[in-house]
Amino acid sequence: MNQAMATPLSLSCCSPTLTRSTLFFTKTFPFSRSFSTPLPLSTKTLISLSPPHRTFAVRAESQNGADPARQYDFDLFTIGAGSGGVRASRFASNFGASSAVCELPFSTISSDTTGGVGGTCVIRGCVPKKLLVYASKFSHEFEESNGFGWRYDSEPKHDWSSLIANKNAELQRLTGIYKNTLKNAGVKLIEGRGKIVDAHTVDVDGKLYSAKHILVSVGGRPFIPDIPGKEYAIDSDAALDLPSKPQKIAIVGGGYIALEFAGIFNGLKSEVHVFIRQKKVLRGFDEEIRDFVAENMALRGIEFHTEESPVAITKAADGSLSLKTNKGTEEGFSHIMFATGRSPNTKDLGLESVGVKVAKDGSIEVDEYSQTSVPSIWAIGDATNRVNLTPVALMEGVALAKTLFQNEPTKPDYRAIPSAVFSQPPIGGVGLTEEQAAEQYGDIDVFTANFRPMKATLSGLPDRVFMKLIVSAETNVVLGLHMCGEDAAEIAQGFAVGIKAGLTKADFDATVGIHPTAAEEFVTMRTPTRKVRKNQASQGKSDSKAKAVAGS
């Protein structure tokens, strides 16, 4: 592996992939038990085994290192007004605590001196990215409409500057809503960079604030490997706010950020090349989903360069960029974007100087209650590199507020967290992949459907949908649900309730479908595509035969 391309484990809070290898199990058991030992499966409970965290001596229900006789400026002082920080501060205030949060001045591109209330998700992550996804999908819909009788006198044109201006206006509106939410909850918002001075003191641009508890919720930042010419590259922050649309763009990375931006720029009619170090995209996702999404993105004109690592970037006299890899050089790019992971934004916060334990990747070590090695200091969200998704940070924030100010020690619940990739076609899923399920439980039944959606029968486009259920052969509990195709995220969100509740395949079979929809396929798949057994070869095919008739 090219050492320059070593990617941090941390992902965005918007990330759909559970960090490291969060696995789903069905019975509480000691961490000392071998991970390879199959576990008995309850029909009603799915719990997750998150990456092991340090267990500290001081528990959540104690005074947590606070001096009961001391007077503090605030009960809770939060560094970072992103999704998790705002949620924790607001709930703390609702529970009767005095609360303050500090945040850097607003900017669409983050830096050591800029940030903004709302954090990555609102300003340079989930929200603006989804708006650009919407914008890019219209070109495909224009193509689809021809088969339904629509005709256009001229080719529709896209105005990039209008999109970015409208997007930025929406971000300002949302940031204002976040500020008002804090104000209405009685949370004091302080603009500036926070740094921890001691276990109960935060310095914000030279002014000191004392707090009974300090919460670190600073999120993460994009990571670009240190290669010659890296100054010519852009990251995901910049890609959301470019002054002009790329004509030809290289996207380095095979994760969800890379695929989402590949779909965005492809839909906006840029020439898109994706360079990945491995043979496949989306490491950690279900293998069939990985294959299906790459194949369908390629059909839309995206060119994948597999097993290629960047070596250098050069700039020609005409301003065009060239990307040199271990296999050769591709020239003529207007932009080169790196989507090679994110790192916890914990540098220069004063953590180590006050005794907070920080991992090699910069993530803050916490226990099950989000408490650090310093009893009065806590951390949530991407800064801890647990499960880096916005809804998870929100959950962690509420759990923390309950633990500290509601006399209700609460651990975040990482069971059956659904996730999505807003690629084109999009991906949605919840629970175990087939590979994880086979490793943990041995005997599983796999149900798949690969079909042409109804809309494609008239559009004439090569769009397809892939859907998959993974079921325990022993108990009939549905362990995982995965989909790639239109509305996958929306469909997966609904089924996530059932997966977390521990529903069985029989429960799915007993549910009446809504016709005609793609979602009904999840409750009409009756025959396993294959049966995977621990002590014998798999029975069946690696993929289902394509169904030529939509709605079947």
UniProtKB/Swiss-Prot annotation:
<dbReference type="InterPro" id="IPR016156">
    <property type="entry name" value="FAD/NAD-linked_Rdtase_dimer_sf"/>
</dbReference>
<keyword id="KW-0676">Redox-active center</keyword>
<feature type="transit peptide" description="Chloroplast and mitochondrion">
    <location>
        <begin position="1"/>
        <end position="60"/>
    </location>
</feature>
<dbReference type="InterPro" id="IPR046952">
    <property type="entry name" value="GSHR/TRXR-like"/>
</dbReference>
<feature type="binding site">
    <location>
        <position position="341"/>
    </location>
    <ligand>
        <name>NADP(+)</name>
    </ligand>
</feature>
<feature type="binding site">
    <location>
        <position position="84"/>
    </location>
    <ligand>
        <name>FAD</name>
    </ligand>
</feature>
<feature type="disulfide bond" description="Redox-active">
    <location>
        <begin position="121"/>
        <end position="126"/>
    </location>
</feature>
<feature type="binding site">
    <location>
        <position position="103"/>
    </location>
    <ligand>
        <name>FAD</name>
    </ligand>
</feature>
<feature type="binding site">
    <location>
        <position position="390"/>
    </location>
    <ligand>
        <name>FAD</name>
    </ligand>
</feature>
<dbReference type="GO" id="GO:0045454">
    <property type="term" value="P:cell redox homeostasis"/>
</dbReference>
<dbReference type="GO" id="GO:0034599">
    <property type="term" value="P:cellular response to oxidative stress"/>
</dbReference>
<dbReference type="Pfam" id="PF07992">
    <property type="entry name" value="Pyr_redox_2"/>
</dbReference>
<comment type="function">
    <text>Catalyzes the reduction of glutathione disulfide (GSSG) to reduced glutathione (GSH). Maintains high levels of GSH in the chloroplast.</text>
</comment>
<keyword id="KW-0496">Mitochondrion</keyword>
<feature type="binding site">
    <location>
        <position position="515"/>
    </location>
    <ligand>
        <name>FAD</name>
    </ligand>
</feature>
<dbReference type="GO" id="GO:0050661">
    <property type="term" value="F:NADP binding"/>
</dbReference>
<feature type="binding site">
    <location>
        <position position="283"/>
    </location>
    <ligand>
        <name>NADP(+)</name>
    </ligand>
</feature>
<dbReference type="GO" id="GO:0006749">
    <property type="term" value="P:glutathione metabolic process"/>
</dbReference>
<feature type="binding site">
    <location>
        <position position="420"/>
    </location>
    <ligand>
        <name>NADP(+)</name>
    </ligand>
</feature>
<keyword id="KW-0934">Plastid</keyword>
<dbReference type="GO" id="GO:0050660">
    <property type="term" value="F:flavin adenine dinucleotide binding"/>
</dbReference>
<feature type="binding site">
    <location>
        <position position="194"/>
    </location>
    <ligand>
        <name>FAD</name>
    </ligand>
</feature>
<dbReference type="InterPro" id="IPR023753">
    <property type="entry name" value="FAD/NAD-binding_dom"/>
</dbReference>
<dbReference type="GO" id="GO:0005829">
    <property type="term" value="C:cytosol"/>
</dbReference>
<feature type="binding site">
    <location>
        <position position="260"/>
    </location>
    <ligand>
        <name>NADP(+)</name>
    </ligand>
</feature>
<dbReference type="GO" id="GO:0009507">
    <property type="term" value="C:chloroplast"/>
</dbReference>
<feature type="active site" description="Proton acceptor">
    <location>
        <position position="515"/>
    </location>
</feature>
<dbReference type="InterPro" id="IPR001100">
    <property type="entry name" value="Pyr_nuc-diS_OxRdtase"/>
</dbReference>
<comment type="subunit">
    <text>Homodimer.</text>
</comment>
<keyword id="KW-1015">Disulfide bond</keyword>
<feature type="binding site">
    <location>
        <position position="178"/>
    </location>
    <ligand>
        <name>glutathione</name>
    </ligand>
</feature>
<feature type="binding site">
    <location>
        <position position="129"/>
    </location>
    <ligand>
        <name>FAD</name>
    </ligand>
</feature>
<dbReference type="GO" id="GO:0005739">
    <property type="term" value="C:mitochondrion"/>
</dbReference>
<feature type="binding site">
    <location>
        <position position="83"/>
    </location>
    <ligand>
        <name>glutathione</name>
    </ligand>
</feature>
<keyword id="KW-0274">FAD</keyword>
<comment type="similarity">
    <text>Belongs to the class-I pyridine nucleotide-disulfide oxidoreductase family.</text>
</comment>
<dbReference type="InterPro" id="IPR006324">
    <property type="entry name" value="GSHR"/>
</dbReference>
<feature type="binding site">
    <location>
        <position position="121"/>
    </location>
    <ligand>
        <name>FAD</name>
    </ligand>
</feature>
<feature type="binding site">
    <location>
        <position position="120"/>
    </location>
    <ligand>
        <name>FAD</name>
    </ligand>
</feature>
<feature type="binding site">
    <location>
        <position position="382"/>
    </location>
    <ligand>
        <name>FAD</name>
    </ligand>
</feature>
<keyword id="KW-0809">Transit peptide</keyword>
<dbReference type="Pfam" id="PF02852">
    <property type="entry name" value="Pyr_redox_dim"/>
</dbReference>
